[in-house]
Each structure stands twice: as structure tokens, then as C-alpha cells.
């Protein structure tokens, strides 16, 4: 059996800790034979465990402690610590592993709830489970979210080779915002969401680049954001914004501009991968 979980981008600018979008990069987990102990084969490196301390196995065992150990093989296109939901993908893969082997028959809603409990909020985990675009909130321990189709457009991901830990990126954020600024930040997010619902990527893109919640604070850690925005704007893109906590920057553009933008971004003197992606519509899947 095979489990496949997509990457995700969170925030989309002003949709801070609320908006998430599934992307066509994947964590894939092949479930092999039963074994005496858990072992997860991978070539990711970076100190990621091969035993039951791996997040995937740990998550599965928290849900189903009596699971029979298996040999697992993980391949992952999602680079860690780049703002593309790698930790959320691992958590969701663990939930799917337990659900499959223990025949828990969890609903998608239950999977989102469990994953959001582990991750703290649903902005990455909900699209990883459900696919497409999700707007969510965690209030008094309860998850509220809406899944909707995202407008058709090209997505160009500028993924620096250097990592940026979420903890470091969150560390530069203020504890509070002045009331007047928070009202303005909220109104910007509201217009962005309404524009997306109306398939108006021109207006949505304008709002994406006017975030007041987090990007101006994180820009000191991601100096290439301004460069990418200049390139994107000059070539007719809708917007460029941080993917999650960064350092990845995601460019939204008309499809006919995708290849030109990719080529232009590849010429920047920053060590990075520049990938053409799409919205992933299905979310986590199990292939038997």
C-alpha cells in the first residue's frame, strides 16, 4: 500500500495562520512487510529518524499503540524547513498509516481535527488532508474551516537551499498589534478571501502583497522576497508572497507567464530551486 500526502503553503500573505493551499509536491510512504520493529527507510538525511521516534511512526502509534511494526519506505519531494508544510505532511502521513493498518475508518473531518491538535492550527494540515484551498480557525479547541476551489493560475515556487526554522521565523513577530492596524490587516485578508471566491486573482494578488500581520517582520530573514516581487510585478504576475514562515516565496501568475517567470527567477543570484507547481485537489490519498 502507498500513502501520498501533498505539500502545503500557508498564509497567502494576509491569511495568516488561517489560509492554506495544497501543492503538487508529495511525501510518499510505501507500507512494506511486517517486521520485528519499526523501520522507515529514506534518504533525506538531516537527522530524521529511521525508527519509531520518526514523526510519522510516532503519530501512528499515538493513535493506535498496538500497531504491528512494518518496514516503511519514504520518499519526499517536500524540502524541510522551507515553509512548504513538511511537518504537517509527516503528521498526516502518520494519521493515514494508523487509519490504514488499524482500520480506524476515520473521516476526513476527524483526520483534520487530530492533525490540527498536533500541529496547533489547521492552516497546513487541513489542505494536506482535504486538498485545494482551505480557510480555517481554531477557537476554544474546536476547528472551523471551509474548503473551496482555488482560481486557476500558475504557481512558481522559489525555494532557497538554506533552511529557515519556523521557530526562528515566528520569533521576529510582535506579541500584539495596535487595534487600528489589526483592523486594517483583517480587512485586507477579508478582501483577499472574497476576491479568491470570485475568481478575481488580480484583486486577490493585490491584497496578498499588502499583508500587515507577518511579512514586514519576516522580510529581514527573507531579503529575497523584495527581489522576487520586483521580477514578478514587472512580468505581470498576480502576486508573490512568503510560503508559510518562509524562506520559500510563492508566485501566483497567469498560466501563459509561468515559463517566462521561472526562467527569470532562475537568473537571480540566490542558490534556489524554482519549480512550476499546481494546486493539488485531492489531498492525502491511500493507494491499495
UniProtKB/Swiss-Prot annotation:
According to UniProt, the reaction catalysed is: L-homoserine + ATP = O-phospho-L-homoserine + ADP + H(+)
What's an example GO cellular component term for this entry?
A: cytoplasm
Q: Name one GO molecular function term.
A: homoserine kinase activity
The answer to whether keyword Cytoplasm applies is: yes
What the entry lists under InterPro entries is as follows: GHMP_kinase_C_dom (IPR013750), GHMP_kinase_C_sf (IPR036554), GHMP_kinase_N_dom (IPR006204), GHMP_knse_ATP-bd_CS (IPR006203), Homoserine_kinase (IPR000870), Ribosomal_Su5_D2-typ_SF (IPR020568), Ribsml_uS5_D2-typ_fold_subgr (IPR014721)
Give the main EC class.
transferase
Residues annotated for ATP binding in this entry? 79-89
Localization annotation:
Cytoplasm
- Spell out the family assignment given in the record's similarity comment: Belongs to the GHMP kinase family. Homoserine kinase subfamily.
Kindly provide the name given to this protein in its UniProt entry: Homoserine kinase
Organism of derivation: Listeria monocytogenes serovar 1/2a (strain ATCC BAA-679 / EGD-e)
Amino acid at each position: 500500500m502507498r500513502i501520498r500526502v501533498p505539500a502545503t503553503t500557508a498564509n497567502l500573505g494576509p491569511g495568516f495562520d488561517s489560509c492554506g493551499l495544497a501543492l503538487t509536491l508529495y511525501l510518499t510512504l510505501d507500507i512494506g512487510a511486517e517486521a520485528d520493529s519499526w523501520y522507515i527507510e529514506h534518504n533525506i538525511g538531516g537527522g530524521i529518524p529511521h525508527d519509531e521516534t520518526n514523526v510519522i511512526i510516532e503519530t501512528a502509534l499515538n493513535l493506535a499503540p498496538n500497531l504491528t511494526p512494518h518496514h516503511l519506505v519514504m520518499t519526499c519531494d517536500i524540502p524541510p524547513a522551507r515553509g512548504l508544510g513538511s511537518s504537517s505532511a509527516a503528521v498526516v502521513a502518520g494519521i493515514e498509516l494508523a487509519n490504514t493498518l488499524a482500520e480506524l475508518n476515520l473521516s476526513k473531518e476527524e483526520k483534520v481535527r487530530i492533525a490540527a491538535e498536533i500541529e496547533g492550527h489547521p492552516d497546513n494540515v487541513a489542505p494536506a488532508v482535504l486538498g485545494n484551498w482551505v480557510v480555517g480557525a481554531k477557537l476554544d479547541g474546536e476547528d472551523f474551516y471551509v474548503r473551496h476551489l482555488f482560481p486557476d493560475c500558475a504557481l512558481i515556487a522559489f525555494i532557497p537551499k538554506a533552511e529557515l526554522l519556523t521557530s526562528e521565523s515566528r520569533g521576529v513577530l510582535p506579541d500584539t498589534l495596535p487595534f487600528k492596524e489589526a483592523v486594517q490587516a483583517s480587512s485586507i485578508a477579508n478582501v483577499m478571501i472574497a476576491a479568491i471566491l470570485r475568481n478575481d486573482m488580480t484583486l486577490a494578488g493585490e491584497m496578498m502583497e499588502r499583508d500587515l500581520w507577518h511579512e514586514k517582520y519576516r522580510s529581514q530573514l527573507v531579503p529575497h522576497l523584495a527581489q522576487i516581487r520586483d521580477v514578478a510585478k514587472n512580468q505581470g504576475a498576480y502576486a508573490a508572497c512568503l510560503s508559510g514562515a518562509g524562506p520559500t516565496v510563492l508566485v501566483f501568475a497567469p498560466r501563459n507567464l509561468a515559463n517566462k517567470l521561472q526562467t527569470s527567477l532562475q537568473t537571480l543570484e540566490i542558490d534556489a530551486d524554482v519549480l512550476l507547481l499546481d494546486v493539488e485537489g485531492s489531498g492525502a490519498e491511500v493507494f491499495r
